[in-house]
């Protein structure tokens, strides 16, 4: 058993339905998690700030601040994984939730087993707390990397350091969520190589992620916005229509596994 598996996951549940929070608390505690529940958005923000949880389960329809605004605000100080919960099934709610920084979206009513599976899938991903994020002064040195290594590299105006979990563009620090950082790291490690949406899901979210490929597009859109990338004329992350994404290189085309990236996905082995 790894050291990570020995740590008790901390979960904050923010929902104004007592019956649901009691059910979720009981189920997660039986799974070995420490759970705190809150009935409104302000209390949820305070709990996240005070307890620094690994996971936040956040209802969309909350009294006072709605779940979208709570998620937006907590992203100012926390990189806890966030799963949005909602009785509404509109796709726009799912898109908005992912846009404001949520990692997943689960429609009510849901199976406790499915909830636990999604929590476990996110928690298995490597994480680093905000306490380990370097100060702006520390980050400035990243752009001076003499040569690429397994843990740090420079791609034109972009520099990444995996150990520091830091990104700079033209020497300026860029704040990314863990998912956004991992997406950028995976793509920029091998410029020009096409990575399919399913490969991104498998390698960033985890092979047991329950959801559809649309989540990748939403997080890539957030990433592009933060690094100043124009989707119509990208300088960093380029869309390969119908397949996935690649990090731009001087070459106009490069193949992944020897295949033309313009081939339909059905002809690429998964």
Question: Predicted segment positions?
Answer:
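Positively charged, aromatic-enriched patches within helix-turn-helix-type DNA-binding elements
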Residues: 102, 157, 164-236, 240-243
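Basic, amphipathic DNA-recognition helix from helix-turn-helix-like DNA-binding domains
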Residues: 66, 72, 76, 81-154, ...
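His-Asp phosphorelay/catalytic-motif detector in bacterial-type signaling
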Residues: 8, 52-54, 77-82, 210
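Short hydrophobic/Thr-rich beta-strand motif most characteristic of the beta2 strand and flanking loop
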Residues: 32-39, 47
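Acidic catalytic/metal-coordinating carboxylates
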Residues: 40-43, 54, 66-69, 93
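Short, Lys/Arg-enriched segments at the junction into DNA-binding effector domains
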Residues: 7-10, 121-194, 198, 258, ...
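Active-site beta3 strand of CheY-like receiver
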Residues: 51-57, 62
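Charged docking surfaces used in two-component/phosphorelay signaling
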Residues: 22-30
């Amino acid at each position: 058993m790894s050291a990570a598996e020995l740590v008790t996951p901390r979960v904050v549940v923010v929902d104004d339905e007592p019956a649901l929070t009691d059910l979720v608390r009981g189920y997660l505690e039986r799974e070995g998690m420490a759970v705190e529940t809150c009935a409104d958005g302000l209390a949820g923000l305070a709990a996240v700030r005070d307890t620094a949880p690994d996971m936040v389960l956040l209802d969309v329809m909350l009294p006072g601040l709605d779940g979208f605004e709570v998620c937006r605000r907590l992203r100012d100080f926390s990189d806890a994984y966030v799963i949005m919960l909602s009785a509404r099934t509109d796709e726009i709610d799912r898109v908005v939730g992912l846009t404001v920084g949520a990692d997943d979206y689960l429609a009510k009513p849901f199976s406790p087993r499915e909830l636990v599976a999604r929590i476990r899938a996110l928690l298995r991903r490597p994480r680093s707390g905000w306490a380990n994020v370097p100060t702006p002064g520390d980050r400035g040195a990243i752009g001076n990397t003499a040569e690429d290594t397994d843990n740090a590299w420079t791609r034109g105006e972009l520099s990444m350091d995996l150990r520091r979990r830091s990104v700079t563009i033209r020497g300026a620090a860029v704040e990314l969520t863990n998912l956004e950082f991992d997406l950028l790291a995976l793509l920029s490690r091998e410029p020009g190589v096409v990575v399919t949406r399913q490969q991104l899901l498998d390698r960033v979210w985890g092979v047991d992620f329950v959801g559809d490929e649309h989540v990748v597009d939403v997080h890539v859109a957030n990433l592009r916005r933060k690094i100043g990338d124009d989707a119509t004329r990208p300088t960093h992350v380029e869309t390969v229509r119908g397949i996935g994404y690649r990090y731009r290189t001087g070459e106009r085309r490069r193949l992944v596994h020897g295949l033309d990236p313009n081939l339909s996905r059905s002809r690429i082995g998964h």
